[in-house]
Each structure stands twice: as structure tokens, then as C-alpha cells.
Amino acid sequence: MLDIKITKTTHPKEKPQDESKLGFGKIFSDHMFLMDYTAGEGWHDARIVPYGPWEMDPATTVFHYAQEIFEGMKAYRTAEGKIQLFRPECNANRFNDSADRLGMPPIPPEDFVQAVKALVDVDRDWVPHSDGASLYIRPFCIATDVGLGVHAAKHYRFAIICAPSGAYYAEGLDPVRIYVEDEYIRAAPGLTGFTKCGGNYAASIKAGELAEEKGFSQVLWLDGVEKKYVEEVGSMNIMFKIDGKIYTAACTGTVLPGVTRRSIIELLKDWGYEVIEGKLAIADVMKAAEEGKLEEVFGTGTAAVVSPVKELDWEGKVANISGGKIGPLTQKLYDTLTGIQWGKLEDKYGWTTPVE
């Protein structure tokens, strides 16, 4: 168990008055968690301090070689005023999988969860009260060695910051338009596609901007070898309901193993759906749309939760989905998952963790 030193701010920030205008990741709570790592000593100096900048040398490793990872989680306020997390142990384990791939030291999962809970408890007044809003939690770790040599660092900093946030997409739960990217790729076998590291997201920005210029909300990535099979959307995993069955890319190293994805697959199987995790060609998706068999498409992720898709655009061909409306299964998944997260529905799966 961590011995966390807490230093509370003497100048608390003014909290947002209108939670309908929170946006995503633009406002930050009063405090942050910090912990440092030194080779031979391990993790030490766990602390919660007032939120603010810290000084770093221009030659710090992370600036040059991108040895960093992060996670994305949320804290929810129930109608009874209780605060709870959603499957934080899954985030802790995925964080360590990312750390291993980037040659960084792991954090014991119980310490990771303890740190998150401690910070949320200190800043519990920052957890929004309004329906659909939550406290977004961003744990991250960076290499803090100073020097330009290319090697695994011997010093790291683990930090957690929190941001009260509303809907991730400006459209809210309205169905979005997705552009299928067939020039740029997000990941390839043997690389870092399954991790949450900044490089994956940096490499996706250009394609995302080009898609936005064309009026699309996100990019759907194809596999990096044949540029043929669907993998994931920029900030989401993605699922297709075709002729009553659910298809999604398998987590074989190029797709992020999403916590929301995992939860939705468990829900779907519990409801009797056949879920097929494997290769799905974009050509087969478009053919299913032409034949009227593509019933629903939806993205899944911590930030967006469930995001319905109304249109796929690939090589000038357009697949219109669900008549541009939210499909019934998509709506049921959203209502069920958010119901559990916000404490409106019974958590029979044991997914929520109280912050007390």
C-alpha cells in the first residue's frame, strides 16, 4: 500500500457553474497525484499536491523519444451522491501492458487503483452532478532522464490529473459519420497498436484532420499490412451488427483492448448475441450494407462510451446505417452501460468500485 502524502491547495479554483458547457478535458481539478521512480529504488514519494506545472530540462527523454504512456478512466456521481469508478483494475493492468511494451517499470495494480481513488476522494467535489457528465481521469507516466542517448530511462514520473467533462463528441449521442482511411495506417504487427502511448495518437492526427475537413467525425483504420480489414476508430473500438451477429476486430496486437469494448462484449454474450472477434474486410461491410444486412455500427470507448455510426465512406462509396438514427441495440448498450456506471441500474457484474 502506498503512503500518500496529501498537500491541499490554499487557493481552490472556481468550479464550473454550467455543467452543460464542460466540454472534454479543458478544465482541471484542484489537485494532482505524483510519484517518482528511480532505478534501484523503485517507486517512491507518492503525493497529492495542488494542480500546476512542473519544471523539466529541455533534454528530458520524453521530449525526444516519446517514452510515455497513459490511461483514460472516469469517476461517476450517483443519484445518491456516491462516487464510483468503473473497472479500474482493468485500466491498471492495461497500463502495465503498455509500460512493458515501452520498456517502462510497472506499477502494482493495487497501487495504481489506490492512487486514483485517493485523488478522486480529495477532489470529489469536482465530480459533476449533471446527467451524462463525469470526472475524466488521466493517469500517465513519462521518462524523466536528462540526456540524448536512446535507451530505457532510469527515472520516471507517474502522474494523475482529473478533468470534469461532458460529452466527448459535440454531436453527443447523435450518430456520426466515419471516413475509412486507406492511405495512412495506425498500427502494424509487432508495434505499439495495443498500447496507450502518445505516438499512436500523434500519428493519427493528420488523417483525422483531413477527415474532419470532409465533414467526418472520425477515421476508421484498416490493418497495416493489406489495408483491407477493419481495426478501430481513432478514439474508439468499433463493432458491426451484420445479419444479427456482432463483429469486431480481435485484440491481436494492433488494436487497443478497450475496457468499454470488453464490457460490451460481456453484455452482448449475456444477452445471447454471437460475438465474432476476428478479421472483417471493409469490402464485406460495404457489401452487407448494399444487401441491407448491415443493421448497426457503433464505436466503444471510455470517453464516448457508445457512439452510433450513421455513415461509412470508403473509396467514394457510402454505406448508410440505421436510417441515420440510433439503432435499438446501440441504444440498449448505451443505456445499460451508463446505467451501471452512474448507479441507475444494478451492477450484477461487479464492475463498479466505490470511492469512500
Which residues does each PLM region occupy?
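Extended, Lys/Arg-enriched charged tracts that mediate electrostatic binding to polyanionic substrates
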Residues: 128-138, 142
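Helix-start/capping segments and mature chain N-termini
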Residues: 1-119, 140, 147-356
